[in-house]
Amino acid sequence: MTSGLPLLDLLACPHDGGTPLRQDADALVCPTCELRFPVSDGLVSFLSAQQLSEQDHKERSHRDSEASWYDAMFEGYTNAVEVPAGVRRIGRPTGPVLDAGCGTGRITEALLALGQPVVAVDYSEGTLRLMQRRVKEAGVPVLAVQSDLRALPLRPGVMAAVTCIEVYAQLRADDRRKLLVEFDRVMAPGAVLSMSAYNYNLVFKAWKLRGNEGAREGFHMLGGDYYYIRMTKDEYRRELEAVFDVEELTGIRNIPARSLAQGLRRLGLPTAGDRLLDYMVRTGHRADFWLENVPLVADNVGFFWQAKARKRDD
């Protein structure tokens, strides 16, 4: 990993309107409000100076403690589909890219392959440290930033593109709006946002009809503290269009490869299940990409919505 310290010029104080920061030994300092933001092993932390709710602190604590499990959860078919779907929609940016809610760096790694520097932001130090290890050989600058996404410590108009994968659906309505406004603030004119959300698809609508209250919104079972909501296409589009011009909105992860493999294992065919999943990871996921262009399928069975939205001209 090439040091992200040259990217420090992109940062600004999130508390006083975006004052540029100055370096002072092991911290960045705001010359206006005099707040100090520690820098440790290439990671800049703004979290201690940000006002997080009790719920936010619980979620961050769980993310820290489950960072390794979280990293392993996205291996295989999930990454084979989600990473290319999220990254290819920003095209070939000609400037720094923001990976918002970077987690352990699965998207960050793919963004660095585009050859542009990346600012990787998350509120979990545990996942940020795993991200740093993942991309240490990238050869392209990446800056790890611990921060609340709703108050990004970035100067206005500095990001050529933004990715935000598996974050939006974890926020309630007011916070989703704050997130979009912050993205708009830090994006350069014409910059593209690639962002996913949970799809309230036919499967979950059927679950809802059968009395499953968690089909629409609720809290993830693991940890018990992660809110989520599944959205219809119209709902997601309306929220995005309040701030951005939406250029594409389609369902992704249209083939339930892991569920099919698990079904074969339950039928006493573990080898067949393993072979199916291996095939889908190596080659079969390309069919998932093709189905993104078939609205009748993608809109109704895709697990996620994947959006491409562009910053409006001022």
Please name every model-derived segment.
Residues D9-A12, D41-P93, R106, A110, S194-E217, ...:
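Conserved class I S-adenosyl-L-methionine
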Residues I252-D314:
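A C-terminal cap/extension of S-adenosyl-L-methionine-dependent methyltransferases
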Residues T2-D56:
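N-terminal auxiliary segments of SAM/dcSAM-dependent transferases
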Residues R177-P189:
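A short glycine-rich, Lys/Arg-flanked "PGG" loop and its adjoining helix->strand segment in the class I
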Residues T163:
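A conserved beta-strand element that flanks and buttresses the S-adenosyl-L-methionine
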Residues E217-E235:
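Acceptor-substrate binding/catalytic loop of class I
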Residues T104-A151:
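Class I SAM-dependent methyltransferase SAM/SAH-binding core
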